């Protein structure tokens, strides 16, 4: 391809609305253009990157026995009502009505549709296991679309669904996909880490892993152990509690005045105690239940753990100041567990019962209790892991200090079990004619998100640094002066030779200054750049520059194409 023929409108200025590097560079490099908030058009070079990622995904899915299908984007509401997710999914579900006023949604995910297909087609255990996948546009009505392709309202995903006879079969399918994902992201040239994760709105109780591309700009925090294989999203990470030492004899708890102290920090400062000596008490409302959640004062409540632990209360929300005043008679900053009403369920984090004594709110303005002993001076109805984990805490598997990193989620694998097959009656008959629900797994990759994550991990001040396997083209040939016959003709000859060897090459045939060509090449991120100039040609050589390392080599013209072919084949792991 010739640069003069490519629709590649590069920009020198950073777009005002682009907050993260990937969004900035996708727009500046002429790979995407915004059509509406969270909705983008892929321009030719951007689409080439996307298709390369898709091809890697297809090859690895096919290698594991996956069969590609194409499911509808528009899904009938009755299927979502059958699964119970029509109301559960909330405002992020894009809903619409046809001319007959029938309700539909634009699919953010396809569990209902695929399960409906299977219940109509699968009859016998002989038809299992089955792995079906698609690469499809998805839709989510984000309240605030941001970060370009990282959080859009329209995005491209690969989702594969596995159907097995039993849990053992599901475990085998899960391992296949886990291994396939490891190969996919390795082939894409990305640094990543699989971590334990929360199942979110898709649900299921069998476990799940996220695949995180490591990048400082990542919106998710992960913790990992350098001494064993433990790694988890902070939303899921297990906490290993440790008892606190007692520094003085404990008497009966007593009330003290704490005027104007509404935060943990203010109370600790006023009483001259550590934040870890306090109990943080937060009131939640869920359906018709009131729940008081307790954690140590120096910890943060993990609301995902709270919601998962108290699963039946799907509408669990933090109570506002008016609700706290009505139920407990005080402002939120003075809430505490002592004397909690009987209709209040008190749920404590694992560390709270290990506190020898504690400071807690007295459910009265400007009052706190000191020297309160958990489970002696106030009741605890349930003890659960409810807090966020922090770097430096002991690993729950081996006890070594955990480390923290930032990551971008690009894939997730779920063990769904029978959540959807039972709800939608997707069953099969075993050898004895007995009926069983299919045991399901779900495995998603954010294809468009992977493209953005690759840029977040591979960029510098000059632009994108594409890994060779997913670069729009592998090499750009740049004749520095198109008016010089020798320079122009040598550039053309090298370009044609590279094409004959199967190298994906572009020729910058524009009548532009060398600096403009070099800036565009670096901005777009071609892995290799061949510079053809009269000075080096005088010695029968051209420059070969590696975009990632910046290394420049002088290579004989007659050796160049073979050298580049070898480099590309090595990067693509072609023997």
Swiss-Prot record:
PROSITE patterns: AA_TRNA_LIGASE_II. It catalyses: tRNA(Pro) + L-proline + ATP = L-prolyl-tRNA(Pro) + AMP + diphosphate. Keywords: Aminoacyl-tRNA synthetase, ATP-binding, Cytoplasm, Ligase, Nucleotide-binding, Protein biosynthesis. GO terms for biological process: prolyl-tRNA aminoacylation. GO terms for molecular function: aminoacyl-tRNA deacylase activity; ATP binding; catalytic activity, acting on a protein; proline-tRNA ligase activity; transferase activity. Its main location: cytoplasm. It holds the Pfam family HGTP_anticodon. PANTHER family: MITOCHONDRIAL RIBOSOME PROTEIN L39/PROLYL-TRNA LIGASE FAMILY MEMBER, PROLINE--TRNA LIGASE. Consists of three domains: the N-terminal catalytic domain, the editing domain and the C-terminal anticodon-binding domain. Belongs to the class-II aminoacyl-tRNA synthetase family. ProS type 1 subfamily. This is Proline--tRNA ligase. It comes from Desulfitobacterium hafniense (strain Y51). The gene is proS.
């Amino acid at each position: 391809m010739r640069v003069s023929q490519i629709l590649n409108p590069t920009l020198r200025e950073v777009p005002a609305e682009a907050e993260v590097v990937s969004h900035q560079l996708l727009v500046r490099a002429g790979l995407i253009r915004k059509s509406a908030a969270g909705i983008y058009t892929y321009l030719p070079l951007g689409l080439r990157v996307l298709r390369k990622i898709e091809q890697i995904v297809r090859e690895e899915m096919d290698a594991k026995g996956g069969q590609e299908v194409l499911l509808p984007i528009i899904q009938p509401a009755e299927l979502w009502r059958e699964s119970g997710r029509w109301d559960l999914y909330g405002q992020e579900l894009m809903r619409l009505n046809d001319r007959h006023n029938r309700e539909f949604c634009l699919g953010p995910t396809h569990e209902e549709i695929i399960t409906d297909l299977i219940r109509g087609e699968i009859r016998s255990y002989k038809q299992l296991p089955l792995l079906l996948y698609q690469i499809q546009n998805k839709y989510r009505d984000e309240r605030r679309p941001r970060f370009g392709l990282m959080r859009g309202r329209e995005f491209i995903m690969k989702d594969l669904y596995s159907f097995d006879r039993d849990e053992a079969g599901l475990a085998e399918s899960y391992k296949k996909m886990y291994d396939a994902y490891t190969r996919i992201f390795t082939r894409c040239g990305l640094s990543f880490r699989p971590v334990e994760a929360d199942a979110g709105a898709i649900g299921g109780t069998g476990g799940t892993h996220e695949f995180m591309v490591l990048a400082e700009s990542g919106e998710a925090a992960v913790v990992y152990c350098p001494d064993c294989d433990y790694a988890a999203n902070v939303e899921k990470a297990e906490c290993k509690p440790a008892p606190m030492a007692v520094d003085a004899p404990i008497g009966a708890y007593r009330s003290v005045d704490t005027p104007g102290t509404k935060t943990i920090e203010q109370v600790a400062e006023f009483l001259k105690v550590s934040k870890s000596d306090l109990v943080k008490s937060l009131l939640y409302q869920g359906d018709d239940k009131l729940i008081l959640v307790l954690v140590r004062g120096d910890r943060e409540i993990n609301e995902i753990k709270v919601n998962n632990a108290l699963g039946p209360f799907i509408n669990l929300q933090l109570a506002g100041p008016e609700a706290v005043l009505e139920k407990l008679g005080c402002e939120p900053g003075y809430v505490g567990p002592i004397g909690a009403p009987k209709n209040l369920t008190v749920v404590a984090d694992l560390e709270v019962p290990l506190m020898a004594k504690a400071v807690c709110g007295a459910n009265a303005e400007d009052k706190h209790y000191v020297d309160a002993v958990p489970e002696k001076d106030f009741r605890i109805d349930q003890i659960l892991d409810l807090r966020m984990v922090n770097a430096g805490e002991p690993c729950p598997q081996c006890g070594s200090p955990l480390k923290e990193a930032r990551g971008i989620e690009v894939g997730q694998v779920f063990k769904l079990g029978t959540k959807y097959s039972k709800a939608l009656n997707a069953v099969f008959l075993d050898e004895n004619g007995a009926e069983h629900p299919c045991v399901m797994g779900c495995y998603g990759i954010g294809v468009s998100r992977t493209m953005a994550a690759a840029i977040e991990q591979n960029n510098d001040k000059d632009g994108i640094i594409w890994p060779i396997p997913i670069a729009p083209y592998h090499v750009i040939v740049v004749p520095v002066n198109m008016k010089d016959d020798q320079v122009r003709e040598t550039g053309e000859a090298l370009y044609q030779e590279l094409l004959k060897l199967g190298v994906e090459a572009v020729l910058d045939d524009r009548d532009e200054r060398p600096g403009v060509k070099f800036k565009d090449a670096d901005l777009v991120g071609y892995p290799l750049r061949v510079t053809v100039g009269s000075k080096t040609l005088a010695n029968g050589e051209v420059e070969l520059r590696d975009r990632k390392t910046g290394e420049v080599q002088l290579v004989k013209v007659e050796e160049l194409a073979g050298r580049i072919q070898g480099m590309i084949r090595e990067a693509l792991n072609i023997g």
